[in-house]
A protein has these predicted regions:
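Domain-level representation of secreted and single-pass membrane ectodomains enriched
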Residues: 1-328
């Protein structure tokens, strides 16, 4: 299923292509409505909260779909209206140079009714998480937090490592739910980025670090390399000024500093099918590559000896072009 959402993020129109559902634990997701506030018990919105954050629920945006995607910060509310035990999710997508901070203001999740909330540092698709374990400083087990119970007044906070975060929840008890406040924070050195725009170029950088960083788009795409600088200057400041042009098949000649272009059917970057790998210094590369997979990825591999960067634009592959290539 393809879902297109046009989102206004800080006055910038962002077109996002989503091509697959999240695969939840248990039953398959389906759209459902919730009613904000009216089913909550009275003490859920007690007026004696000293922080003054819950003076009124009218300013909270209701979570209305089982798969709720937003590129906007703000206050959100979810209230269960059925005893259905399906797992649903709230998916936050910030700008490429931002992180997501999630603050649970109140929650009433009955553990005795198998209620549960899980916050994931990353984006989840079909049971796989981006960034994958090989590209993140923490193992997957340490990137998620689960809890249930009841808490009024004291906040519970989580901050993502990149511009994507997911809340998974199962609340099979009518009238129960949660409120939260999401903020988008500046990320001074973004590494792994989920594409939020099909039009805007993005520059992956290693900032001199020994690190692997990946730019992922959730659609088959045409990767246009706008600028390439892999091996420009080392950590001592020595600079190459001679352009080499775009060198190809660098996974064989220069595996420690390269750009891997590929695709996969999921978000696990260890399963990416490599279409090409490039390196070198090229200020005006004439390079485009088609990636005919559901997920398009551009991965910058860095040894830490160079200030590496690559600027790319990943545009959705047109259906007629995709069909023509698949028929060859």
């Amino acid at each position: 299923m393809k879902v297109r959402r046009n989102i206004d993020l800080k006055n910038q129109k962002i077109s996002v292509e989503w091509i697959s559902f999240i695969k939840p634990i248990g039953k398959s997701p389906r759209s459902r409505k919730s009613v904000a506030g009216e089913h909550f018990s009275k003490d859920f919105y007690r007026q004696d909260l000293k922080n003054g954050l819950i003076s009124s629920y009218t300013r909270f945006k209701p979570v209305t779909d089982c798969m709720f995607i937003t590129a906007e910060p703000g206050s959100f509310i979810y209230t269960s209206k059925t005893d259905d035990d399906e797992v649903c999710g709230i998916f936050f997508l910030a700008g490429p140079d931002q992180k997501v901070e999630i603050n649970f203001l109140t929650f009433d999740i009955p553990c005795e009714h198998r209620g549960l909330i899980s916050v994931v540092d990353g984006w989840e698709l079909n049971g796989e998480v981006f960034p994958s374990e090989m590209d993140h400083r923490l193992p997957l087990k340490q990137r998620s937090s689960e809890f249930c119970g009841k808490n009024i007044g004291a906040k519970r906070s989580f901050t993502s490592s990149q511009n994507a975060a997911v809340i998974r929840y199962r609340i099979p008890k009518p009238g129960k739910g949660f409120t939260l406040f999401a903020k988008f924070l500046k990320n001074p050195r973004p590494c792994n980025v989920l594409a939020a725009s099909v039009d805007e170029p993005y520059t992956l950088r290693n900032y001199g670090r020994r690190i692997n960083c990946t730019y992922v788009a959730l659609y088959p795409g045409t990767v246009h390399v706008i600028a390439l600088g892999v091996g420009v200057s080392n950590f001592l400041g020595a600079t190459r000024t001679t352009e080499t042009g775009t060198l190809r098949k660098c996974d064989e000649s220069s595996p420690h500093d390269q750009v891997i272009i590929g695709g996969s059917d999921g978000l696990d970057t260890s399963k990416v099918q490599i279409v090409d790998s490039i390196c070198g210094i090229d200020s005006k590369p004439d390079y485009r590559e088609l990636v005919e997979y559901g997920v398009t990825s551009v991965r910058l591999v860095s040894s830490g000896f160079y200030e590496n960067s690559v600027t790319v634009q990943v545009q959705p592959l047109k259906n007629e072009l995709l069909d023509a290539n698949l028929s060859i």
